[in-house]
Amino acid sequence: MAGVKKNRSPRKPTKLLQSRLKFAHSSATLKKCTECQMSYIIDSPADCAEHKKYHDLHLYGKKWLASWGTAIQDTCSSQYITPPSTSGGNASGNGAKADREDYIVYITPGKTAEVKAMMEIMYIVNNELTAPHDENDFWSEEGTSSMGRAFVYIKDGRAVGAITVEYLKEDDSRGRWMRVSTRELVPEVVPRVRLGISRIWVCRKQRGQGIATRLLECVRKYAILGNEVARWEMAWSQPSESGGKLATRYNSVRHKSGELLIPCYI
């Protein structure tokens, strides 16, 4: 029996679809702020908000609550340490911190709020110096008060300067002399140093007003309770270019050869 041949309808041609890839607009590019040096995407609200916060802290310092930190007091007169501009006859050691224009506080390890506030400052500091972000244990962790301290300079309700220092043991032999001219360490000479300046910073708009020197003097007199140290006993940790200039002004010594030396530690 012959098979029946079925008529087939002509096949419709397959409709092809073209895929399109969407790329981000070219306008979503990085912009680098000329003042704070932060790079951010100008079309990103989150990036812009982060830049605004970073920019404000970098230029003007961090807004500081009066409850953060313990004000340093002169052990003889019981007066707060203040710059000459605010330490006249109207300055009283019994006044509240919030009523004072300028004062210096130290950070207590274990007090979460003030340690966190100081950490925000250190984030800026380490970014500026291209320094490691994991060198805060000696001043921030509870039970480490014998290892170092952090101090903050407060002006008009903002933290405009900060310094962190390590306590150095003479037996550790960490002191060195650094030649100012070449930034090379002098071999086989180990000076006696007692304090290591790990970081020092002043916000951009307050630089050139002596705040860094006041912080250094505070550390020199009060970092070791009841024991003032000499300037040359304060050593620097790999000072930056600006830090090297500060160190040269503050505690460099002139060798008999005529060369200037800065105390450093390793």
UniProtKB/Swiss-Prot annotation:
> Domain of life, per the record?
Eukaryota
Q: Mind telling me which Pfam families this protein's record contains?
A: Acetyltransf_13, zf-C2H2_3
Q: Does the keyword Mitochondrion apply?
A: no
- Name the major location: nucleus
Domain spans labelled N-acetyltransferase: 108-266
InterPro entries in the cross-refs? AcTrfase_ESCO_Znf_dom (IPR028005), Acyl_CoA_acyltransferase (IPR016181), ESCO_Acetyltransf_dom (IPR028009), GNAT_dom (IPR000182)
User: What's any GO biological process attached to this entry?
Assistant: DNA replication
The record's EC number reads 2.3.1.-
Matches recorded under CDD domains: NAT_SF
Q: Which UniProt keywords apply?
A: Acyltransferase, Cell cycle, Metal-binding, Nucleus, Transferase, Zinc, Zinc-finger
Asked if the keyword Zinc-finger belongs to this entry, the reply reads yes
Record localization: Nucleus
A GO molecular function term, named singly, is:
zinc ion binding
**Annotated Gene Ontology cellular component terms:** chromatin; nuclear replication fork; nucleus
Question: Which top EC class is given?
Answer: transferase
Q: CCHH-type zinc fingers: which residues?
A: 31-55
Query: What job does this protein perform?
Result: Probable acetyltransferase required for the establishment of sister chromatid cohesion and couple the processes of cohesion and DNA replication to ensure that only sister chromatids become paired together. In contrast to the structural cohesins, the deposition and establishment factors are required only during S phase. Acts by acetylating the cohesin complex component SMC3.
Family statement drawn from the similarity comment of this UniProt entry: Belongs to the acetyltransferase family. ECO subfamily.
What PANTHER family does the database record attribute to this sequence? N-ACETYLTRANSFERASE ECO (PTHR45884:SF2)
Q: What is this protein called?
A: N-acetyltransferase ECO1
Species source reads Eremothecium gossypii (strain ATCC 10895 / CBS 109.51 / FGSC 9923 / NRRL Y-1056)
